[in-house]
From Swiss-Prot:
DNA-binding region: 56-153, 193-289, 341-435
InterPro entries noted in UniProt: B3_DNA-bd (IPR003340), DNA-bd_pseudobarrel_sf (IPR015300), REM_fam (IPR039218)
Region (Disordered): 1-46, 295-334
Gene Ontology annotations for the cellular component aspect, listed alphabetically: nucleus
Keyword Nucleus belongs to the record: yes
Protein name: B3 domain-containing protein REM12
Location in the cell: Nucleus
Alphabetical UniProt keywords: DNA-binding, Nucleus, Repeat, Transcription, Transcription regulation
Coiled-coil segments: none
Organism expressing this protein natively: Arabidopsis thaliana
PANTHER family: B3 DOMAIN-CONTAINING PROTEIN REM-LIKE 1-RELATED, B3 DOMAIN-CONTAINING PROTEIN REM-LIKE 3-RELATED
Taxonomic superkingdom: Eukaryota
Lineage, uppermost ranks: Eukaryota, Viridiplantae, Streptophyta, Embryophyta, Tracheophyta
Main location: nucleus
């Protein structure tokens, strides 16, 4: 996308319509200062645009990000355009209306994420956006100030003028909007998901308490109606009630029917994602831990066990003791090796929700208990980032999940292996291991 430097307006986030200058000279000075600040060559901008082919994303306006006056940017997108921590400002442009806003840009070290602050609320207010509203942005990185090109959904529908590539990208993005929920930049990815345990009382009483932090961050902390979205796309109507203590409870006949229709059982973990569809809040069932993945048994594990078996001839004295001791050591080594591998099966729900669940025994065997950022390493050493959101093994991968599977030739219904690599002072890695190999031992990154 080619941006016109003349389209970039004043540099403060609270600008609306500029007052008429007192003289022609003042006007000339204002224009000169404005152009100086944002002036860049067309060649430089085109180079930036060509290097970010997949730089569009959907930004959902919520009560939470308006209250916090902050919009988080997708981590994989900011990495792809080379956004650096030194940046303290980002320019939002609307080419159609010839307006621009300069907003503060900050970096959250704990979530490794860039976010817009001190200006997001004013920007939404100026553009008439309330909770449930949607923006479509294209991020362009550059040597001076990063740019967010603003493309409203209205401009897609009415066919107003704009750069051809930008219009195509936005139209394509709109058609894939449901699949991009996981890339919604309203907050860090972990705030949209919650993993709960279904109890017998939940079903009998048709009530389930929701975590306060989850309801608050997703604007679900007020009483009202909510839809529950099942695996097949069917919806159930339920109610959110607020108790005197401030706790939010999900209740109603629809909640019980939703649980039963989707095969949820007492004692089972299930994960819900908070989404908005045409301004209506929904809780979408992502998956359940006990039904989506096979336990850790795969070709890599089985082959490693075969390789580790020892055939020792009968002997006496020290020879017999050494053979027994060696057998034990190798068996322990084999166990440690096979514990590093897990076999998973890709389901349509995984791709749609951009998530996966790691078996609990795999988590325990490798001591995986630290939440936060992880790395997925593909066959060609390409990296994708994921976030471990709970100690029960729930992992959110964002839009990179589909790309990871496509790049490594994994299709829906097929199984694949991951090897866990834990090195000091680095982000833990899950490395792709093809099912076609008999056994591959990885001790560290090459």
């Amino acid at each position: 996308m080619v941006l016109n430097s003349s389209d970039l307006g004043p540099s403060r986030c609270d600008i609306r319509d500029l007052p008429a200058p007192s003289s022609t000279n003042d006007q000339g000075k204002t224009e000169l200062a404005r152009k100086k600040k944002v002036k860049r060559s067309n060649t430089e901008i085109e180079a930036d645009a060509s290097s970010s082919d997949n730089s569009c994303f959907v930004a959902l306006v919520t009560a939470s990000n308006l209250r916090k006056d902050a919009l988080y940017l997708p981590q994989d997108l900011t990495s792809s355009v080379g956004l650096e921590r030194k940046y303290r400002e980002i320019v939002v442009t609307d080419e159609r209306e010839r307006r621009s806003w300069a907003l503060d840009l900050r970096f959250n070290k704990s979530s490794d994420t860039f976010y817009i602050s001190r200006g997001w609320r004013s920007f939404c207010d100026e553009n008439g956006k309330k909770p449930g509203g949607v923006f479509v942005f294209k991020l362009v990185g550059n040597r001076e100030t990063p740019v967010l090109s603003f493309c409203s959904t209205e401009s897609i529908n009415d066919g107003t003028q704009g750069h051809k590539n930008n219009k195509y990208n936005c139209m394509e993005l709109k058609s894939k909007k449901k699949r991009m929920r996981c890339r919604d930049s309203t907050s860090p990815s972990q705030n949209r998901f919650m993993t709960l345990t279904l109890t017998h009382d939940n079903l009998i009483k048709s009530r389930r308490y929701l975590p306060l932090s989850f309801t608050r961050d997703n604007g679900l902390d007020k009483p009202g109606m909510i839809f529950l979205l099942g695996k097949t796309g069917r919806k159930w109507e339920a109610n959110l009630l607020r108790e005197a203590s401030g706790r939010i409870v999900l209740t109603g006949k629809g909640w019980k029917e939703f649980a039963m229709a989707n095969g949820l059982k007492s004692g089972e973990l299930f994960t819900l994602e908070a989404i908005l569809e045409k301004g209506t809040p929904m809780l979408s069932l992502v998956n359940t831990q006990s039904t989506n993945y096979r336990s850790q048994q795969g070709e890599c594990s089985r082959d490693s066990e075969k390789e580790s078996s020892i055939c020792a001839e009968p002997s006496r004295g020290n020879k017999k003791w050494k053979a027994t001791n060696n057998r034990k050591e190798r068996r322990d080594s084999s166990s440690a090796i096979q514990n590093r591998y897990v076999t998973l099966t890709l389901t349509p729900e995984d791709v749609r929700a951009c998530t996966l669940i790691l078996p609990s025994q795999f988590m325990k065997a490798n001591g995986i208990n630290k939440l936060g950022k992880k790395t997925l390493l593909g066959q060609n050493r390409k990296k994708w980032f994921a976030y471990l959101l709970s100690k029960s093994g729930f992992v959110a991968l964002g839009s990179g999940w589909k790309g990871f599977c496509e790049a490594n030739g994994v299709k829906t219904g097929e199984s694949f292996n991951l090897e866990y690599i834990d090195e000091q002072d680095t982000t833990p890695v899950f490395k792709f291991c093809s099912n076609s190999v008999e056994y591959v031992k990885f001790t560290s990154l090459p």
